[in-house]
A protein has these predicted regions:
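N-terminal secretory signal peptides and thylakoid transit peptides that target proteins
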Residues: 1, 204-235
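Flanking helices and flexible, charged tails adjoining ferredoxin-like Fe-S electron-transfer domains
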Residues: 1-34, 38-40, 44-49, 84-190, ...
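Ferredoxin-like iron-sulfur electron-transfer modules
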Residues: 7, 20-52, 63-81, 98-104, ...
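Short cysteine clusters
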Residues: 42, 53-56, 60, 79-85, ...
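Charged, compositionally biased non-catalytic regions
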Residues: 59, 64-93, 215, 219
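Conserved small-residue-rich
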Residues: 120-127, 147, 216-231, 271, ...
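Terminal interaction modules at protein C-ends
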Residues: 229, 233-285
Length: 380
């Protein structure tokens, strides 16, 4: 159709904007939604101790989150729908339909792959319908440090678009601190930088030459696709980007299988260890560039058996089930599943039994034993 030919990137991969209907006027609420909560993931609920974690409560600008009696509730009427709680929670207690970590990465990856520049902005800053390379969010603080890290390892053409004074007058009073901290952390881990654009007149909406040119180097297209690309050069480029996004998604999904081969996914009491989406993104980036591991500064617990009474408080608090205690009382921490929240150390009643120390992040680089075996056999 004419629509497919005029905008193949959106047609093949889903619109980069929330509402592809160009006739509909800009409505900020179309880009926002109230998160839902899963109390089974909440560290505070699992431990029964308020001191275990307060990240969502601390970041919420409307004080609309209530954690009480093993439940996590959001006051829908008070919620600003900024999404900061989603980014702040290390265990994915909060979720939204349109802004999961992997969806946010994919959205940025599509734009950054096709355009000379990708801009991440908010509804208040943009105040209009976004172009194909503009990622419009409720608040830029929705992107966690882990998502920024994954973006910066793959792309060097991503900027934040926020005109001066936008954050100063925003009701999301905690958003500016949230995104500045997240970006600063990711920049420290990668050595890369996020651009900043404050003038809407300087926004660049040009496709990359490589994107336009990719019709000539795409060997994966069938004959019918080649006929279409002859009249629409960017269609092949859109398919190449779709292939790249799908390949990235497959590599992240494969991590679960690789970890099962290396250390197993189930604990002694048959609970399944859980990889959060943020951790998958970080591990995916490190699989691609393991040399970055020493620069990713995280803290993880170490166990001192001489001070431990095997009470199980730490294991019961860890909702990703990264901690296991076997029938002999030996405690094991599966580092890929640890989200570095520190709750286990906080709830431990025995001082020194668990201590947060700098993590050896090379443990997040998972060996692919099947691939290694294939390479070994091919070398024979």
């Amino acid at each position: 159709s004419l629509q497919v030919l005029s905008n193949p990137l959106d047609a093949l991969m889903g619109s980069l904007s929330i509402d592809p209907n160009t006739d509909k006027p800009f409505e900020p609420m179309d880009y926002k939604e109230i998160p839902w909560s899963n109390a089974n993931r909440c560290l505070r609920c699992a431990s029964g101790k308020a001191e275990a974690c307060s990240r969502c409560l601390d970041v919420c600008p409307a004080n609309c989150i209530d954690i009480h009696n093993q439940s996590v509730r959001i006051d829908d009427e008070a919620c600003l729908q900024c999404g900061l709680c989603v980014a702040a929670c290390p265990t994915e207690t909060f979720n939204t339909r349109r802004h999961t970590s992997r969806m946010l990465y994919d959205q940025v990856a599509r734009a950054a792959s096709a355009y000379e520049q990708c801009y991440i902005t908010c509804t208040r800053a943009l105040a209009r319908k976004p172009e194909g390379n503009e990622i419009c969010l409720p608040c830029v603080g929705m992107l966690s440090a882990d998502i920024w890290f994954s973006i910066l390892t793959d792309f060097d053409n991503v900027s934040v678009y926020l005109p001066l004074g936008v954050c100063d007058r925003c009701r999301t009073t905690t958003g500016e601190e949230a995104y500045t901290q997240a970006i600063a952390t990711a920049e420290e881990w990668t050595g890369a930088t996020v651009g900043l654009e404050v003038d809407g007149n300087n926004l660049n909406h040009n496709f990359t030459r490589a994107y336009i040119r990719s019709q000539f180097i795409s060997n994966a297209m069938n004959g019918a696709e080649r006929l279409v690309s002859a009249s629409s050069p960017v269609l092949a480029g859109a398919k190449a980007i779709a292939d790249r996004i799908n390949s990235h998604a497959r590599s992240l999904d494969k991590l679960q299988t690789q970890l099962d081969d290396v250390m197993g996914l189930r604990t002694t009491d048959m609970r399944q260890s859980m990889l959060t989406q943020d951790r998958r993104l970080v591990m995916g980036a490190l699989q691609h560039d393991p040399d970055l591991a020493p620069y990713v500064k995280l803290a993880a617990p170490i166990w001192d058996s001489s001070k431990c009474t095997v009470c199980g408080d730490c294991k019961n608090t860890c909702t990703t089930h990264a901690i296991d205690i076997d029938e002999r009382g030996k405690l094991t921490i599966k580092m890929p599943f640890c989200v570095n929240c520190g709750a286990c150390e906080i709830v431990c009643p025995e001082p020194g039994a668990l201590t947060m120390v700098p993590m050896n992040t090379s443990e997040l680089v998972v060996r692919d034993r099947k691939a290694e075996e294939t390479e070994r056999l091919e070398a024979l």
